[in-house]
């Protein structure tokens, strides 16, 4: 099974502020949906709570250390390892956040789907340093800022060189 991380990063690898994404880019939301639809998504509890519901068209697995925590429409796992063990029959597992789960999953990741957002913003959660791990760019496309997207962004797919 491929382990893939998908994230949108502003300058300095910023991914969040106060458990929210500090931008709204419809182009990135469309990209996220296109990449993840039909694939299982693994997320931390706080990420799930910030989304507020299971993502439709995807198997949703939430990692929570609280054994009593549950939510309708999701599977709960006590760790990343346990979450991935639930998905052994899948071709690709998509790790969708948050920061702690990205940091834990990154050393095992085979692929990164990153949206680079051309914005200098303030926040408290960052994507871990990934450049030193050796990646090959597979694909890159650009979306300019427009009336619906406040910032230009690039969609980049990277594959781990092993």
Swiss-Prot record:
Reaction equations catalysed = (6S)-5,6,7,8-tetrahydrofolate + NADP(+) = 7,8-dihydrofolate + NADPH + H(+)
Q: Which GO terms describe its cellular component?
A: cytosol
User: What's an example GO BP annotation here?
Assistant: folic acid metabolic process
Sorted UniProt keywords = Antibiotic resistance, Methotrexate resistance, NADP, One-carbon metabolism, Oxidoreductase, Plasmid, Trimethoprim resistance
Involved pathway(s): Cofactor biosynthesis; tetrahydrofolate biosynthesis; 5,6,7,8-tetrahydrofolate from 7,8-dihydrofolate: step 1/1
Q: What CDD domains does this protein's entry cite?
A: DHFR (cd00209)
What GO molecular function terms would the record report?
dihydrofolate reductase activity; NADP binding
One Pfam family assigned to this protein is DHFR_1
Subunit and partners: Monomer.
Remarks, miscellaneous: The plasmid pAZ1 determines trimethoprim and sulphonamide resistance.
Q: Which family does it belong to?
A: Belongs to the dihydrofolate reductase family.
**Biological function:** Key enzyme in folate metabolism. Catalyzes an essential reaction for de novo glycine and purine synthesis, and for DNA precursor synthesis.
> What is this protein identified as?
Dihydrofolate reductase type 3
Q: Which organism is it from?
A: Salmonella typhimurium
Q: Which gene encodes it?
A: dhfrIII
